[in-house]
């Protein structure tokens, strides 16, 4: 395990798939972040082909634009009921979701789901180490967003909720 600067994260994300996601999000003028386990695994120096992307806006639109940029070798699955999409390309799976926030009515365990910000989406994550996000937009490519101290928790071996 090692600490990673934003520049080092940008270097680790210097792959065609991330640059294409960046181009798709920038074209649609939407903020876009790789989140969760993929980011955690970068710090742990573990390889992963399972990428989760949060879009402040429509994850489905960014996934569709990515498919257009990647061409016929990419396969897209859209799950409108859940507001998600998955793009498979050269052995890599990228899951897209729009940032959302959840609230609950008294006496109900069923969440009320609304569009949200990156912070809203990070707040609903299970653990701080899975709330880590790295920006993919060109102007902030590689910038870590860690509002809950997830990197410190990772180093300290602590599992806690945001």
Region spans (language model):
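Catalytic cores of the polymerase beta-like nucleotidyltransferase superfamily
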Residues: 1-162
